């Protein structure tokens, strides 16, 4: 693995262990050229996934982008990074095991909503407000009412 700091192609693995959900291998690496340490993750990729957006545009599935959008919804909420990683891993596994190589972006959004609903209700509403394109306060009220909560 090439060092991200100096570009040296000869780095050493100092520690290797599975992640909490065993979906990846976490490796601590050391670069003897610049004495830097960095972490890498090794994951199984069953197939290359392509996301089909609303306008028909296609792009490669990006798990980092998915994690970023979930982190934004969870910002300043009592949600730890491991919980976010579990949601991302679960979504990626479901998409890969679906048998389809092209996935509609709407399906990904619904999976994120499903994951956030069980994790944090505020993060769930935040994500829904962007995903479902809420335009006014009434949209929030209507959505919260479907959750069984009161908008008052």
UniProtKB/Swiss-Prot annotation:
Tell me which Gene Ontology terms the entry assigns under biological process: negative regulation of DNA-templated transcription
What does the record's cofactor remark say about binding? Binds 1 zinc ion.
InterPro entries to which the protein is assigned, alphabetical: ATP-cone_dom (IPR005144), NrdR-like_N (IPR055173), RNR_NrdR-like (IPR003796)
The answer to keyword GTP-binding applying to this record is no
Q: Which cofactor does it need?
A: Zn(2+)
Where does each unnamed zinc finger lie? 3-34
- Sequence ranges of Basic and acidic residues compositional bias: 12-21
Instruction: Report domain ATP-cone positions.
Output: 49-139
Keywords of the record, alphabetical order, are: ATP-binding, DNA-binding, Metal-binding, Nucleotide-binding, Repressor, Transcription, Transcription regulation, Zinc, Zinc-finger
Identify one Pfam family in the record. Answer: ATP-cone
Map out region (Disordered) in residue numbers.
1-21
What GO molecular function terms would the record report? ATP binding; DNA binding; zinc ion binding
Family according to the record: Belongs to the NrdR family.
> Per its UniProt record, what PANTHER family does this chain match?
TRANSCRIPTIONAL REPRESSOR NRDR (PTHR30455:SF2)
Its job: Negatively regulates transcription of bacterial ribonucleotide reductase nrd genes and operons by binding to NrdR-boxes.
HAMAP family of this UniProt entry? NrdR (MF_00440)
Q: What is this protein called?
A: Transcriptional repressor NrdR
